[in-house]
Swiss-Prot record:
Listed name of the protein: Deoxyuridine 5'-triphosphate nucleotidohydrolase
Cofactor(s) annotated in UniProt: Mg(2+)
Function: This enzyme is involved in nucleotide metabolism: it produces dUMP, the immediate precursor of thymidine nucleotides and it decreases the intracellular concentration of dUTP so that uracil cannot be incorporated into DNA.
Catalysed reactions listed for this entry: dUTP + H2O = dUMP + diphosphate + H(+)
Entry-linked Pfam families: dUTPase (PF00692)
EC number, as in UniProt: 3.6.1.23
Keywords: Hydrolase, Magnesium, Metal-binding, Nucleotide metabolism
Gene Ontology biological-process annotations: dUMP biosynthetic process; dUTP catabolic process
Protein family: Belongs to the dUTPase family.
Length: 149
């Protein structure tokens, strides 16, 4: 598996261990909530959860913040803007926007794993303005237009 150096900085609010991959084939690493006290989210509520970390991501890459499947399945908590994008030129604290999609209030505690981060390559588009686009069988159909008999 390919490895790429990514600089990581612990901020003043960080305590605990640095994130690490949990298996040889893992594509993501978990980050933990850095909280002064518990955060309670009622159904439909959202919060920004600090991770206490910032990154220096190599140009041509991004880090994506994704929900942890176990967290979502057990509690209804998920990352709101999935995947959240952390751009290569961002140097601030990574915060995770979580929302409670469940039916009961959920408490997020300090050091709880709140998201998984995945390093991913980025390709920027070079836009070309045209008057017409090529035809396809699908055309302009969208939002449920495919798969019909």
């Amino acid at each position: 598996m390919q490895k790429l150096a990514v600089k990581i900085k612990k901020l003043e609010n960080f305590h605990g261990d640095l994130p690490q991959y949990q298996s040889l084939g893992a594509s993501g690493f978990d980050v933990r909530a850095q909280l002064a006290g518990p955060v309670v989210l009622n159904p439909g509520e959202r919060a920004m959860i600090p991770t206490g970390l910032s990154f220096e991501i190599p140009l041509g890459y991004e880090i994506q913040a994704r929900p942890r499947s176990g967290w979502a399945a057990k509690s209804g908590l998920t990352v709101l803007n999935t995947p959240g994008t952390i751009d290569a030129d961002y140097r601030g604290e990574v915060k995770i926007i979580v929302i409670n999609l469940g039916n009961e209030a959920v408490t997020i505690n300090d050091q709880e794993r709140c998201a998984q981060l995945v390093l991913a390559p980025v390709i920027q588009a070079q836009f070309e303005l045209v008057n017409e686009l090529s035809d396809t069988e699908r055309g302009a159909g969208g939002f449920g237009s495919t798969g019909r008999a």
